[in-house]
Amino acid sequence: SGLSATLCGAPHGHPLLVELAEQAGVELTAQSEGDLGQRLEAAMSQALCTHDAVLVIGSDCPGLTVQHLHQAARELARHDAVFFPALDGGYTLIGLRRIPTGFFYDMPWSTRSVMPETLRRLVALGWQVWSGEPLADIDTADDLVHLPKHWPAPRVEQMT
């Protein structure tokens, strides 16, 4: 299929990350140092050394499905950048075919301005951008209402 997946996490070598990578049959790589933007740029740049495009997702969006990934990959073949925005103003998935050096520098992370600022920067570059429907991510205890009801999570159930 020409697709590959890598689990990029910290701390590198953590037993849970190792187990997840083994179960999924994917490579485990260390996250670089720095803020979220520096880590994103490093991971994307590394992937783009050997691939034509890269999709990055976080681990906090339970509603992001395989179908979303396939849709994003299809759209990235026709656009310079793709997103599934988060309901809170960020994004749950970002896909790029190239990464300008310093693109994520001074991004207002963890604010409602992340997606609008990212779009502003991409429009300034003249890029074609595709965006899917907004999805919920889990950043706070209040966001736990977005967990699928069928997930067995007894500790979470005690919190909600």
Where in the sequence are the language-model features?
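A short, N-terminal amphipathic alpha-helix
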Residues: 1-4
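Short internal beta-strands
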Residues: 6-10
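Short, glycine/polar-rich helix-capping loops at beta-to-alpha or helix-loop-helix junctions
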Residues: 12-18
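Short phosphate-binding loop-to-helix
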Residues: 19-53, 111
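Catalytic metal- and UDP-sugar-binding loop of GT-A-like glycosyltransferases, i.e.
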Residues: 57
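Conserved donor-nucleotide/metal-binding helix-loop-beta segment in metal-dependent transferases, i.e.
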Residues: 64-88
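Short, glycine-/small-residue-rich phosphate/pyrophosphate-handling segment
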Residues: 100-121
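Conserved alpha/beta core of the MobA/IspD/sugar-nucleotide pyrophosphorylase nucleotidyltransferase superfamily
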Residues: 114-160
